[in-house]
Structures are given as structure tokens and as C-alpha cells.
Amino acid sequence: MATDLHRPVKTLLETGPADASPPASHNGADAAVRVEGLTRSFDGRAVIDDLDLTLKAGEFTVLLGRSGCGKSTLLRVLAGLDREISGTVLVPRRRAVAFQAPRLMPWKRVWRNVLLGLPGKPERAVAEQALAEVGLVERAGAWPKTLSGGEAQRASLARALVREPDLLLLDEPFGALDALTRIKAQQLVAELWQRRGCAVLLVTHDVDEALLLADRVLVMRDGRIAYDTPVALDRPREVGSPGFTDLRSRLLTELGVEGAGRATGLSAQSAGHAQARTESAESPDASPARPHPHHGDPS
């Protein structure tokens, strides 16, 4: 079960019989992810430092933090894309990733992109079913270069969903979208999560986005989870709804931008991106590794 330095991340199915029950979280609920004592270093500096984390099955968790704090590195470890680690990491075998850049192969039509990395020779109908779920089936035969930004991101989501994941990992998937398309994409992800019932971990700088989507919000600082709060707000949610403003203020404080939203009229999204830009873009966490399709990544 443990993953020693230079050894692979273990999946639930690799650590026991195929019909074994998933591990229990600290509160007794089934856990989709369990991490204990995880450390990942770059050039002698621990980007993730003895981190512990449990994600419950079916829970939508959002991870916030400054650039370079280790959040994208953590996501890559959970995806199986970064294995130079020490510690214990248990994740479902069926997992998938969607990144900010859709990473579609320009020489393959959309439906073929959706099927990339799947074992065997799945038929076009399999891709079209996933594309229909994200409202893009009519573009199945299109070339990626003809897609809008929002369409390309939906194709990326279809590529993740076709794997029937128990864990969906999202690394700022809405960051490059315009405001209206971003809202629509957020709504789509919320609908897909409620329909699929898988665990979701979303990395973002947008505090409002976190509160609109999450069951639980984590703030990462100095390679560890520094703040962990449930989001006990009724769904569907709106910015400014009861309890929303207080939670936003608390999260902005944890992110080191206390008073930014209230004093200047700056939105929580803008505040989050502003604090992110103050950090070095040269950190290991800010430079995602190229994904490997055999570890559950949809690229």
C-alpha cells in the first residue's frame, strides 16, 4: 500500500483483491483517496511536505493556494503522472484528468481524441455517448482547430468521462475561458458530478468558483493542507447568497488577501489571480509535467 521513494503510486485495486472494499476515511465514510506522509521534492526543496489527506467518495473538493504551494504537483501525484515521491498514496484505478489546456491532438477528429488512451478498439459510439453528455455530439467529426475554447474544454471533459472515473481531477480547467463560457462550464461540471457521483478534486485560484461548486474547500500552504472547511450552503448557489460572503472572506484571509474584495471592490476571482501572480512562475508547481495516457490521464 505504501509508496516508497521512486516507486509507483498505488491504486486501490493494486493494493488488494479486486472486490476489496475501499479504505475508510477518518470519519468512517468510504474514501476515494487516502494520502499519508506524502513528500515530493525538487532540487532539494520539498514542494509537498509530509502531507496527509483523505477525500471521500462522491465528494466535490476544491483546492486553493498560491502558485508554487504544491497544489498542481499534488494533483499530478494523484493522477499517477509524478511518481518521484515518498509516502502512502491510495487512489482509484479509474481516474482521469482535465487540464486548463484541452490538449487535443490536432490531427485526430474530436471523437478520436475522446478515445485516446482507452484499451482495445472502442467504437465511435462510445465517444459520441460521452460527447452527448457534455453537449458536443454534433461536433464529433470536427477537427480540433475548428472548436471554440469552450467546445475544446468540453471535448476534454468528454475524454475524461469516457473512462467512467471514480476520481476526476481538474487542474484549473476554466482558467482560459471567457467569463460567460466559464460560468457555463462550471454549471456543466456541477451537473456531471451530480449525475456521475464520482469524487472530484478541482484546483483553482477562483474563490467564488470554489464556493459555487464545492462540498469542501482546502487551502494549501507550504506543501501542506493549512485550512480545511466544509461548504454547508444549499444548492444551487449564487454569489452573495446567505453565508457565501462570510465564507469568501475567510478563504481570502487564508490566502493572504484579507480585505481585498471588500475594500477595493475586487472580485474574489480577481483577488485570487492577483495573489497568484505575486508568486514566482518559475516554481516546480507552476510547470506541469506532460501527462502520460496510461495513468488515467485523458490527454
Ranges and model annotations:
Residues 157:
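Hydrophobic anchor residue at the start of the ABC signature
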Residues 64-66:
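The feature captures the beta-strand-to-loop junction immediately N-terminal to the Walker
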Residues 79:
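Helix-to-loop junction immediately C-terminal to a conserved catalytic motif
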Residues 122-134, 250:
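ABC nucleotide-binding domain "signature" region
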Residues 143-147, 151-153:
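Conserved ABC ATPase signature
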Residues 162-166:
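A short, proline-enriched helix->beta-strand linker immediately N-terminal to the Walker B motif
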